[in-house]
Every structure is written in structure tokens, then in C-alpha cells.
Amino acid sequence: MSTLPPGPSGLPVAGSTLSFVRDPFSTYERWAEEYGDIVATNIAGRTFVMVAHPEHIERILVTDQQHYGKGSFQRDQLGDIVGDGLLLSEGEFWHEQRNRLQPEFFREQLTQYATMMVDETRARADNWTSGETITLNSELQHLTLAIMARTLFGFDIEDAEGQFANTARTISERFNLSHVSTYLAAWIPTPRNRRYRRAMNNLDTVIYDVIEARRAQDDSPNDLLATLIAAVDDPETDLTDETLRDEIATVILGGHDTAALAMTYTLTALARHPDAEAEVRAELDEVLGDDDPTVTDLPALPRLDAAVKEAMRLHPPAYTLFRESNRPMKIGEYDVPEGATLTIPQWVVHHDSRWFESPWEYQPDRWTDEFEASLPEYAYFPFCGGKRHCIGMRYGLMETKLVVATLLQRFRFDFQLPELSFAAALTLQPAEPVSVRVTTV
């Protein structure tokens, strides 16, 4: 006899859709508190199973990964944006693309990127005046776009930066889980969907313009874009410009926003915890002095590392991930039907008191070697895990640390909001602009 996981029955037909739309974060927390680590419910007509225990998560992402694909839920939501890019592609095609692109994120390449990251950060900070109030999350989104454009695609985004940032923001907002329209087909002409369609057209125009401009160059840099174009132009492959477009969209939309959020949440957390901030600043002074940070400095900055780790635990930019079972499966003592959508929320696991004492408090000092060794493998997974872990994990962590270090060398950040609140879009977005006053140090 099949034993389904426990969970809320919700309303007839709608199931738990309305409570999830109203507040997905509280809903996740309530499910975990009331029903445990494995919870089944109905959302928008789909069987959803929340899995929130490290042991089960490891089975899904590693041990039994072949039985859990990306699935129709993610394809319905994201297929328009990233097509067959790395995020959604599967099987042999995914393996080939992953192997093709992975070298661009090896240590040798990252070392070359580091100087560009610091240069772009200093250029952005040059626009700030001591005593002024800035919208930190917006500034950092512009910065990470500029860094990504220069390091991975070899072009200066300055002229199109504002348009590109607005386009990316509009696309992300289309997937705010707290809006009913998110669960409607993209072709339905709601105001949000119309804005989304315009943004998608803008995205495609920018990407194809970048491809055309690169092909017209006589001497182009050896970067991610060059690797992609060479693969498409190779007669031995079946890749097309549409493949190229999908991978560029995946990297841009998947990379710049999560990094900007990690930076935002690290800087605001430090601003609200003066003791932790003082420790990081003292470490930067001791190791760097007045020098710019380099990639070789990062191992000597453990307090900076802990500050970033703790911010990504407390406010994980990727707050959940999804899989779909491609056959009936057993998770723990429960049966999961074929075609169920699994939601695996970092939001719940990262705030679980079984793994993290005082889980809702920012405590970077918790990140000792002994503590990390004691953690279950998937109690902390800000970059997903298994063979499909984020391809840009090293790039994103290095970028976040270099940017935070560079900015702290120049400014103090006075957080202007009483506290952060969040919106569940493609990533963990601030519900309102993050205003900070910057003061030179």
C-alpha cells in the first residue's frame, strides 16, 4: 500500500496555492513545523513534495539523481528564458555543454577575471559620494552585470547597462511566487505578462547584437563567448545560434543576480552587526593594507569568508530548487509518485535549528573548521549540489568576496531600513529597495 507524505489538504481544487501565493516563506516554514521533513500538497493542480532533510536531499541530488530531472514545472516557468541552456538541458547534450563550458570557470581563468572584477568595482564606487544614500541592491546588480559582460563576454556594457538591468529585473519579477499571474501561462495578456514579453524581446535583441558584434571582430578575447561561438561554428556539432543565445541567457540571468544579492545581504548584515563588521575590517587592514584585493589574498581572509557564508545561509539568494520524479520513488518512509514536483528549500534547511544554533541570527563566528566538519553534507547548499551544482560557484564566490572587500576598504554602509523583507521571485529579492548611506572611511 502506498504511503504518501503528510501535508495540508488545502482548499478544494486550489489545494495550498493561495497560502503559498500569500507568503511562500512562511508557508515553507509552517509545513516543516507541522508535518516534518517531507511534505506533500497540491499547488496549482500539481503534486508538490517539499523535502527538507540533508539525508533525503543528498539522495535526490546525488545518489538517485538519475531519477529526478528538471521536469515540466521548471520548463513551463523558465523554458522561454533559457531554452536548452545548462539550467534546463538534460542527458548527453547537458554533459557535452557542461564539459565545454566548465574550463571557463577553472582556477586559471578565474585568476584572470579577478583584476577585472576589482577594476569594475572601483569604477562603480567612484560614482558614489560620501554621505549620499544609494540603492545598494540596484547598484550591485549594475556592477555584476558589468563584471559579467567584461569577464565572460568581452564587451563593455556601459551604454546598455541600465536597459539590461531593467530587463533582467522585469523577467525576474514575472516569477514572483506571491503573484497569481506567475501561475498563469505567459501568453495570457496580463500587465505583468506584457511587460515580461517586452523584456524578453529586449533580452534577445541584446544577446544577438552581442553575438553579431563578436563575430565581426578580427581579434577577439579568449573567453566564454569565444568558446560558445567556436562550438556553434564547428561543423562537427549540431549547435546553432539559438543554442548560443540560450547559454548566454542562462549565464547572464543565472549569475549576475545571485552574486549581487549575496553582496547585498553580506554588506547589510555587516552594517547591522558592528562587531562582525569590525572584525572583517581589521582583517582587511592587516592582510591588504591599502592594496587592492587579489585572488591570492582570499585564503588569508577567513573572517570575510565567514561573513559571506553566513549571509548566504541566512538569506540564500537561491532559496529553493526544483526536481521532478521520472518514476515512482521512495523518500524516507514515504512514496512519491512519478511526475511529482519536488521543492527543496534552502530557506527551510538553512534555518533549521538541528544544524544551526540560533538559526535566524547572523553569526559569522559559527563558521569554524570544526563546525563545518560537523554539518551534514546538504545542511548548507547555496549553490545546489551533485553533478548539477552551479557551474559558476567558484566565480560567484570569488566575485562576491572581491567586491565586498573592495567596497569595505572605501566605505561604511549605514543600513536605512528597520529590517529586510523578501519577495520570492526567481531569486530571494528584497521586497523593497535596500537604501544605505555610504561614508568614506
Report each predicted region and the residues it spans.
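N-terminal membrane-proximal hinge/A-helix region immediately C-terminal to the signal-anchor transmembrane segment
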Residues: 1-96, 111-124, 143, 155-159, ...
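Cytochrome P450 heme-binding "Cys pocket" and the immediately downstream C-terminal segment
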Residues: 274-276, 373-375, 393-429
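Cytochrome P450 heme-thiolate monooxygenase catalytic core
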Residues: 70-75, 93-94, 109-261
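Conserved cytochrome P450 K-helix E-x-x-R motif and the immediately C-terminal K′/meander segment
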Residues: 17-36, 291-332
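Conserved cytochrome P450 K-helix/beta-meander segment immediately N-terminal to the heme-binding cysteine loop
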Residues: 66, 322, 344-371
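Cytochrome P450 I-helix active-site segment
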Residues: 5-10, 114, 118, 219-226, ...
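Short, small-residue alpha-helix embedded
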Residues: 258-271, 403
